[in-house]
Design a protein with these regions (language model features):
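N-terminal Rossmann NAD(P)H-binding glycine-rich loop of SDR-like oxidoreductase domains
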Residues: 4-26, 31
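NAD(P)H-binding glycine-rich loop region in Rossmannoid oxidoreductase-like domains
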Residues: 46-102
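A conserved pocket-lining segment of Rossmann-fold NAD(P)-dependent short-chain dehydrogenase/reductase
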Residues: 89, 144-149, 192-193, 199-221
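Glycine/proline-rich active-site loop of Rossmann-fold NAD(P)-dependent oxidoreductases
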Residues: 172-175, 188-201, 233-244
Length: 282
């Protein structure tokens, strides 16, 4: 039975992917910053599938060398998901960018050392169109880091660029393949109390902390589709060497609020004029 290493096992996307992998017959080893959260992860995954004999844990830190080689040892595939998400401190370069870049360096080196078949990275559309003012983007587009972009966009762009630079550097020296998944805003049910950064938008619309909507459009994708894409990226023969934008549709915030209101939630009905959108930050 093949085994997959999943970094950052307590996260929104990770929990759905771990469930998917076990359902498909793969054993999983996942990393946590603290093993104190082990039972939390087990309880979350057990909502979808039995973890008996299929899930094991290790403790890792994106900023520390210790344990990475041992974590990946014996694994056939790597799903590297662990990366800092935007918080109230997301303007701090050291909090967001440094762990993202150093984390993928450590994970790639461990994967290479352990002869992993394929390395799948969770990137983001933030690495695709985070600075250019275009109406359409594809997998050839990259965020221009010479422009004024947020640390989160910088973190995702630099981390993914490191992946492809690493693969180019080791071309012909390893059989390991690589794939990047670039999700947009990921919505859907969470398996734990960690609802994910994207779902915080929905939470703020229904808990009253955002008293108005802005006429801003966002691209969205369902969490189950994101998990499925990570799985297919791992097994599909046509996936290696490519980046895949995971985005299904787009919606304006007033549309999202209407869907929430139509389904019994109390979302704001007041729409802020577009010219004020730049003044307010959500």
């Amino acid at each position: 039975m093949e085994k997959v290493f999943v970094s950052g096992g307590s996260g929104f996307i990770s929990l759905h992917l771990i469930s998917k992998l076990i359902q498909e017959g793969y054993k999983v080893r996942t990393s946590l910053r603290s093993l104190d959260r082990k039972q939390e992860v087990i309880d979350a995954v057990e909502k979808e599938v039995s973890t008996a004999g299929m899930l094991e844990f290790c403790e890792l830190d994106l900023l520390k060398d210790e344990g990475w080689d041992e974590a990946v040892a014996g694994c056939d595939y790597v799903q590297h998901i662990a990366s800092p998400i935007p918080t109230t401190n997301s303007d701090d370069y050291d909090i967001v960018v440094k762990p993202a870049v150093n984390g993928i360096k450590r994970c790639l080196n461990a994967a290479l050392k352990n002869n992993v078949k394929r390395f799948v990275m969770t990137s983001s559309v933030a690495a695709v169109g985070g600075s250019n003012h275009k109406f359409e983007y594809d997998d050839t587009d990259w965020t221009d880091l010479s422009m004024d972009v947020a640390p989160y966009q910088t973190s995702k762009t630099k981390a993914e660029q490191y992946l492809w630079d690493f693969m180019k550097e080791h071309e012909g020296k390893t059989d390991m393949e690589a794939v990047a998944i670039n999700p947009s805003m990921v919505f859907g049910s969470s398996l734990s109390d960690d609802i994910g950064a994207s779902n915080l938008v929905i939470k703020r619309l229904i808990d009253g902390s955002l008293p108005f909507t802005l006429n801003i459009c966002i691209n969205i994708v369902h969490i189950k589709d994101v998990a499925d894409m990570h799985f297919e990226a791992m097994i599909n023969d046509k996936a290696p060497g490519k980046r895949f934008i995971a985005s299904n549709n787009h919606m304006f915030f007033p549309e999202i609020a209407k869907v929430l209101n139509d389904n019994g939630f109390k979302a704001p009905k007041m729409k802020l004029p577009s010219f004020l959108a730049r003044v307010f930050s959500i």
